[in-house]
Amino acid sequence: KTEYTNASTTQMYNSEKYEWSYDLLKKLGIPTDILTDVIFPGEIVGKVKPELAEELGIEQVPVVAVASHDTGSAVASVPVVDQKDFIYISSGTWSLMGVELDKPNTSDGAFNHNFTNEGGVNKTIRFLKNIMGLWLIQESRRQWDREGELLSFDELERQANAAEPFASLVDPDYAEFQTPGNMPKRIKEYCKKTGQKVPETKGEVVRCIAESLAFKYRQTVEGMEDVTGNKYNVVNIVGGGIKDKMICQFTANATKRVVSTGPVEATSIGNVIVQAMAMGAIKDINEG
């Protein structure tokens, strides 16, 4: 069987009808008989196989379908009171930034902002934008390591905080930044090409990245509000990126929103919450 949150990212699934897009697939010559039934997070799909239970030394416990798309599980872990008031960032190598909707938004505005509709827990829609995230810092750090100087993230953050603010900005989603390589060099070339001050030190490069991400988040918040017609007062950041306190603070400054952080292990916690709901340990996602 195919789990809903994953099916929704294949471009073969109709999230309005909750079924495969059979007509479209037939027109494209894609055989539909290879597609399996779609199941939803929280459904019990069977029990652990006897041989596996024996190997693990456990009983044949139920197997629960969770949000198998990692961002789907991460969003399920976001600790919020008002489901309509928050915008989330699942922060890691990529930043997945969006809101939860009851149904897909396929408006011209969504298309123009390059927003996508992906499935979530409880048949919700994760209406989001994919943004290049901490990859830029990670790849810069790898380059400096290749050059013989591996600095901790804490040290890079210290140097960045000491650098001049708003000296230069880049588009984190610029095509040249997408692949592995000498990221500091590419960032410097981008700044030179766009007539900006070229960052020279490691601290200047990292500050450029951090501020650029924060402004990208602001642009996305404004786009989300424009397309949905809602006002989002809180930005909830989950995932490993919350360890970067500087970017979290810059995000609060740029978006002029309250920023709430945690959990770090968002995907794992969201996974457990769905299993707990399925087994009756908690009554709903809010209790989780």
Identify the meaning behind each predicted range.
Residues 1, 12-22, 26-27, 50-234, ...:
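Active-site core segments that coordinate phosphate-bearing ligands/cofactors
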Residues 5-7, 32, 122:
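Short glycine-enriched loop/turn motifs at secondary-structure junctions
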Residues 25-43, 272:
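A conserved helix-loop-beta module that forms one wall/lid of the active-site cleft
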Residues 40, 239, 263:
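Small/polar loops that bind or transfer phosphate-bearing groups
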Residues 43-45, 73:
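Active-site neighborhood for divalent-cation/phosphate handling
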Residues 1-14, 37-40:
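Short beta-strand-loop/turn "lid" adjacent to the catalytic site in phosphate-handling enzymes
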